[in-house]
A protein has these predicted regions:
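Hydrophobic ligand-binding cavity/cleft-lining segments
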Residues: 1-38, 163-164
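Intrinsic-disorder/low-complexity, polar/charged segments enriched in Ser/Thr/Lys/Arg/Asp/Glu/Gln
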Residues: 3-9, 44, 54, 67, ...
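Hydrophobic/aromatic beta-strand elements that line small-molecule binding cavities or substrate pockets
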Residues: 9-10, 55-61, 88-97
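Hydrophobic pocket/interface hotspot
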Residues: 19-23, 59, 70, 105-107, ...
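Short, intrinsically disordered, mixed-charge
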Residues: 21-29, 64, 128-132, 136-140
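Beta-strand/loop substructures that line and gate deep hydrophobic ligand-binding cavities in soluble
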Residues: 79-128, 145-147
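Short, highly charged C-terminal tails/helix-capping segments
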Residues: 136-164
């Protein structure tokens, strides 16, 4: 697999343990419509926005307060030609000590490259979920995940309200 991908780097005043706990609380920052387990090696979960995006993801590496790595096992998008663009990509959350005692979170979706038809939408979406929702969960205790009943229009409007 290529090491190319999309990345987001953020710094926090919170401890590595607090950042880690927020990362594995996927329902707290990505979607409340996640089924399955999201905290330990070999856990699998499903992310679903009906008729738009469906992913089955396995945790392949989990080191508390240091990293979480997901492997996308299956993926379908309704809005691109190659619906399986994410399949076999890797999503990494790497936590480390930064300057002045701050905690650094480096998110990388390895394999999500500009050549993918979904790249612009996916890059923007990760910017919202990791750059805004996960950040809010880490700093305030409350993220901005998709609600179980949200459709794509509601999700898009929420992203635009934060970006705009």
């Amino acid at each position: 697999m290529t090491e190319q991908g999309t990345s987001i780097i953020q710094e926090f005043d919170q401890t590595p343990a607090k950042v880690f706990e927020a990362v594995i609380d996927v329902r707290g920052w990505w979607s409340k419509n996640i089924t399955g387990s999201t905290a330990a090696p070999a856990d699998e979960f499903v992310y679903d926005v009906p008729d738009v995006h469906h992913s089955r993801i396995r945790l392949v590496d989990v080191v508390p307060s240091q990293r979480v790595v997901w492997r996308v096992l299956d993926n379908t998008f309704s809005f691109v030609q190659d619906q399986a663009e994410w399949t076999d990509t890797e999503i990494r959350f790497e936590i480390s000590a930064g300057a002045d005692g701050r905690t650094v979170l480096r998110f990388t979706h390895v394999g999500l490259v500009p050549e993918f038809e979904c790249y612009d939408v996916c890059h923007k979406s990760w910017g919202f979920y990791v750059g805004h929702s996960l950040r809010k969960l880490i700093t305030t205790g409350t993220g901005l995940p998709n609600e179980i009943t949200d459709d794509v229009e509601v999700i898009g409007a929420r992203m635009e309200s934060v970006a705009g």
